[in-house]
Amino acid sequence: MQPLFKRCGAEFFGTFWLVLGGCGSAVLAAGVPQVGIGYAGVALAFGLTVLTMAYAVGHISGGHFNPAVTVGLAASGRFGWRDVPPYIVAQVVGAIVAAATLASIAQGVAGFDLVASKFAANGYGDHSPGKYSMQAALICEIVLSAGFVFVILGATDKRAPAGFAPIPIGLALTLIHLISIPVTNTSVNPARSTGPALFVGGWALEQLWLFWLAPIAGALVGALAYRLVGTPSAQR
């Protein structure tokens, strides 16, 4: 196992890449006239960030890039609880630095208003892309976060085909975005939500609690579900 500072460094860079690539595609490329990538392009971008960084640094840190994933892996017994806080700090800092980088790029075009653009922040109610309620957002984020952690645990199981885990994980994140961008702008990742929210302020910070609570709760559900169905009977 790599030293903790190296693993946290890998988590920093992985989360930085996720937020810069995923949120960057939403802020810079989704609505470009005629050639904008739209929801499908943004969903694919998020999946690609995880797939590429999982191959790049997964062997160093495990490739979490997400506080909810870290908590879910710890709850499943795959990761030590004592390393959860430093991993989460590294992930959140990586997300904030990525959001700052993205803001500096986005503001390089005349007329860009960071707050008015919503800067890929997550929200519900009036701040949901489809105006979905808080209850709908809560259910969506819990269920999809549970599914994401379930896929991660299955794909990284020792009984699963070796070397392919980043592919189903990246595809799962793409699918999650295809489902939930209209609902919450898709979080399933508290660090990803925190970076943009700090720059938007106001409503984004007021609603940030949901995008910590729901993904972590969902991760715990996903971990429990995989323990129930994925653990060999002799080990229960």
Curated annotation (Swiss-Prot):
The record marks 23 as: Involved in tetramerization or stability of the tetramer. The chain crosses the membrane at residues 12-32, 37-57, 92-112, 136-156, 163-183, 197-217. It comes from Bordetella parapertussis (strain 12822 / ATCC BAA-587 / NCTC 13253). InterPro entries: Aquaporin-like, Aquaporin_transptr, Aquaporin_Z, MIP, MIP_CS. A motif (NPA 2) lies at residues 189-191. Channel that permits osmotically driven movement of water in both directions. It is involved in the osmoregulation and in the maintenance of cell turgor during volume expansion in rapidly growing cells. It mediates rapid entry or exit of water in response to abrupt changes in osmolarity. This is Aquaporin Z. Belongs to the MIP/aquaporin (TC 1.A.8) family. It is a multi-pass membrane protein. It comes from the Bacteria. GO terms for cellular component: plasma membrane. Coiled coil: none annotated. NCBIfam families: MIP (TIGR00861), PRK05420.1 (NF003838). It catalyses: H2O(in) = H2O(out). Pfam families: MIP (PF00230).
